[in-house]
Amino acid sequence: MIWVAVVITMLLFILVAKPTGIYLEKAFQGSKKLDKVFGPFEKLIFKITGVKEYNQTWKQYALSLVLLNGFMIVVVYFIFRLQGVLPLNPAHIEGMEPTLAFNTAISFMADTNLQHYSGENGLSYLSQLIGITFLMFAAPATTLALVMAFIRGLAGKELGNFFIDFTRALTRVFLPIAFMAALVFVALGVPQTLDGAVTAQTIDGAKQSILRGPVASFVAIKELGNNGGGFFGANSTHPFENPGQMSNILQMMLMMLLPTALPFTYGRMVGNKKQGRILFVSLFMVFLLGFITITTSELNGNPALNAMGIEHVQGSTEGKEVRFGTVFSSLYATVTTAAETGAVNTMHDTLTPIGGLVPLVNMMLNTVYGGVGAGFVNIIMYAIIAVFISGLMVGRTPEFLGKKIEGKEMKLIAVTILFHPLLILGFSALALSTSLGTDAISHSGFHGLTQVVYEYTSSAANNGSGFEGLGDNTPFWNITTGLVMFLGRYFSLITMLAVAASLKEKTVVPETVGTFRTDNGLFGGIFIGTIVIVGALTFFPMLVLGPIAEFLTLK
């Protein structure tokens, strides 16, 4: 029965992808019906804020994005610092420590949601609503706006205006869908209140304080926007965030909704629907392989316990919620790292070595399917690399969407693809070379190395999940992961927008018999191979020293 539920869940991922992709294309490219519904409200916003409707250059678009995001980071930083004297603080929570406020503000603006604090004890309701929830809308709206400009550039059209795209992302996508999802979560038992903690009497007569809050609205945008941060420290293992299997499936659907839709949006916007389908199918195959790997490893149980003759019919149950079970915990772990959300319904630090390898690889690749917007930019980056390699093999100038891929584009892509592992491995080396980093490690040996690398991988990929055995709420970890999150977020977005702008200016080369097609199974295979060879092999030495070595040791 559990496998039937898994198949149905995956079919739901597939069934909603195309309709959502079509809706996104209409939402951003203009639809009379949508303009009639949302247009008056959007025009009012533009009038109040003074936004002028004109097309920006890629530099203007990128500058607008960075300045607006930077302003939001500063505002939310001071909300965190001053929350102790601000209203909506029934628990009388003190202001955040400076480096923790720095880390948290960047974390949520970068759509990472790395949490070095416990949600219910670290933030007031005002901070949760005005700080955290606000950024949970603004962060994915930023990248959804950018990916639309990116696709327009690839299609040879004007990039558009960041502020208009940003507003449409909020009004036409995130606000309506999150509102409906929040109502469903309330119906499924997720609380939504501004009242303080309630005192309950336990069976043995003791009194217990049960924390609550505006959780349903928080969880809706947490999953839809690929944010991942928890209202409670236990994240989606907490029964108030994720009461049962229905809420669990809904959360996974929300996580996958926009990332899986974007290939179809892309296909419609560039006039090559078949290429969009090929990208979707190729990535789903990689996703499926990851799920099979982690599930097989977790169902085989803990090798150390197996050697003692302990029954393991349910697999490795350490760190997992009984109401979800091993299979759905494995699926959730695959989804949350494939879609770069970072929400967890099981503790990733307790996964088996190969089980923990899958989330780590998903984040290192950062492209299966990746987070809202930013993930799809990485997908196209790998697609262009695949075309470039194929062109070199047959002695032709590589072409993508009829545009020649030349030195300028490949230099930008080369720098972008090297920057991600440089952040992860460079800062991991720094942490391992000083006691400021190693003092946080709770396990020695191979697992300890994996804890460190997982933290920086999660930060660079804007995922936010963690091997929570790491004692990371220290100035060193707050500052270094904050820097990694900021650089990992904005560097690749800007460089790839420059690539799209460069391709926009090029003339379309007529298709000939020798043109390498990017809308068939051959390209799909080369695309997957490129992801594995260029992406995975970059990190292979580290994976051997971490989870693979731990697996071999346990065996």
UniProtKB/Swiss-Prot annotation:
It is a multi-pass membrane protein. One of its GO terms (cellular component) is plasma membrane. One of its GO terms (molecular function) is P-type potassium transmembrane transporter activity. Keywords: Cell membrane, Ion transport, Membrane, Potassium, Potassium transport, Transmembrane, Transmembrane helix, Transport. It comes from the Bacteria. It is found in: Cell membrane. The keyword Transmembrane helix applies. Its main location: membrane. It holds the Pfam family KdpA. The chain crosses the membrane at residues 2-22, 60-80, 130-150, 173-193, 246-266, 278-298, 374-394, 412-432, 483-503, 525-545. Belongs to the KdpA family. Part of the high-affinity ATP-driven potassium transport (or Kdp) system, which catalyzes the hydrolysis of ATP coupled with the electrogenic transport of potassium into the cytoplasm. This subunit binds the extracellular potassium ions and delivers the ions to the membrane domain of KdpB through an intramembrane tunnel. The system is composed of three essential subunits: KdpA, KdpB and KdpC. This is Potassium-transporting ATPase potassium-binding subunit.
